[in-house]
Structures are given as C-alpha cells and as structure tokens.
C-alpha cells in the first residue's frame, strides 16, 4: 500500500491500531492513539466493571423522544454536533413499531456486541451458558507488553480528566513504545509523545472534536517520519526498476563498505 498511511483510533480502536503496527509491520507511517485501551495487568479489563455496566445499560425506550432525552442526559458533555449524530444513527424503531408514528425504539448496537469486547463468549464453543470460567479479553494488556515492538511514530492524545490515561500509565506508554527498534530501517527515527486536552475525559474526541483534530493535524504536519517513509517507498521502487547488473554492482559496493566497518 502506498504511504503515508496514518492510523487513528480511540479507546479499544487505539489498542487495535497499535496492534496492527506490530502484527502488520510498517503499515503506518505514524499513528495517533486517543486515550487508548492499553494498560498494565493491574489496569486490565478484569479490574474494571465494564461488563457489569454494560449489562445494566438501558437499550430500549417507549418512544424516540424518551431515547433522545436519555442520551442527551448521559452524554451531556459531548459536542452538540457529535451528540446529534449519535442520536441520529444509534437508535432504530423496534419491529412492532415500524408502522407506528411513534413507538418503542432500541439501540442499534445491543449489549451483547459491547459485552464481548470485555468478556470472552465461552458459551460459543462449550455450548453451555452457565458454569463456565469467566475469562476477560486480554487485548489491552497484550498490547501493553508489545509496546516496544511498535513500528512507527506514535502520539498519545489523552483527556486531562480521564481515569484510563492517568499520569502513571502515560509514563509507561512513553517509556515503552517503539523502544525495541522492531523492523527499523537505517536512518529511521520514531517519535513518541503525548498531548493532553484539559477538562475532557475518556470521550475526548466526542467532547472536543475540534481541539483533537487540530492537535492531530499539527502532529501529522510536523512528523518528519512520514516524509521519511514516503522517501523509503520511492527508493524501494527505484531499486526494483534497476537491472540485475546494476543491483549486483550496488551489492558489491555495499559489501566492500562493510569490510571497513566490521
């Protein structure tokens, strides 16, 4: 794929973008992780109450008006345009109310789809819905252990009031990310940094989309690693276009140079 490719992800999406940087080496020229769900074992999904919160979450309302009122209350800190989009696309009419002018509505995405992000659905393999060991998803902790293998520059964009990206965790991210020089090319540099959006929480891209967009644009504009990756791609294409004789001459010259270095 032609570079630059820039990875941007929020929460679990940030974890998945970072994982792609490791499993699909050199896919991204840079990535921006917004309050990513990446953390040490003591902050893994098993330590949070996300499963319980999901099961308690309401998913149905008598009318669309009731649903809209509930969502506006729950997400009152969100930017108005973002909240309007959420209301527009997250609610649908129940089957029995399609022919009615106003009837029961439900969330488009139910509890199950969210719950399996946190807890593994063991009943699928065992066929038993009870009596099974409770196994939480390990992706955020797995990615924490792989941070040293990240293959591109990374910006951690975090909410100042987020309980997920607390200072201790941010320090761990910065100290571990891309430190093992995995799949690194000669002359390549990888920049790792953080930016904080004050007075926002874990939902910072929904609360302050303009501020987040400005920070992301500034990072992309100033990240020299993006230009470096594009140049590498062009050099690689030029090499492929050389004749075999020219490639052999270059290889011989390189080996001669190495003799003076090794």
Swiss-Prot record:
Which GO cellular component terms are attached? peroxisome
What is the enzyme's main class? hydrolase
Q: Give the pathway annotation.
A: Mycotoxin biosynthesis
Q: Note the InterPro entries from the entry.
A: AB_hydrolase_1, AB_hydrolase_fold
Compartment list: Peroxisome
- What EC identifiers does the entry list? 3.1.1.-
Q: Report the main location listed first in the record.
A: other
| Observed effect of gene inactivation | Abolishes the production of AK-toxin and impairs the pathogenicity.
Which Pfam families does the record associate with it?
A: Abhydrolase_6
Name the UniProt key words of this record, in alphabetical order: Hydrolase, Peroxisome, Virulence
GO MF annotation terms: hydrolase activity
The residue numbers the entry assigns to motif Peroxisomal targeting signal type 1 are: 260-262
Q: What does this protein do?
A: Abhydrolase domain-containing protein; part of the gene clusters that mediate the biosynthesis of the host-selective toxins (HSTs) AK-toxins responsible for Japanese pear black spot disease by the Japanese pear pathotype. AK-toxins are esters of 9,10-epoxy 8-hydroxy 9-methyldecatrienoic acid (EDA). On cellular level, AK-toxins affect plasma membrane of susceptible cells and cause a sudden increase in loss of K(+) after a few minutes of toxin treatment.
**Misc remark:** Gene clusters encoding host-selective toxins (HSTs) are localized on conditionally dispensable chromosomes (CDCs), also called supernumerary chromosomes, where they are present in multiple copies. The CDCs are not essential for saprophytic growth but controls host-selective pathogenicity.
Q: Which family does it belong to?
A: Belongs to the AB hydrolase superfamily. AKT2 hydrolase family.
Q: What is this protein called?
A: Abhydrolase domain-containing protein AKT2
Organism field: Alternaria alternata (Alternaria rot fungus)
Q: Which gene encodes it?
A: AKT2
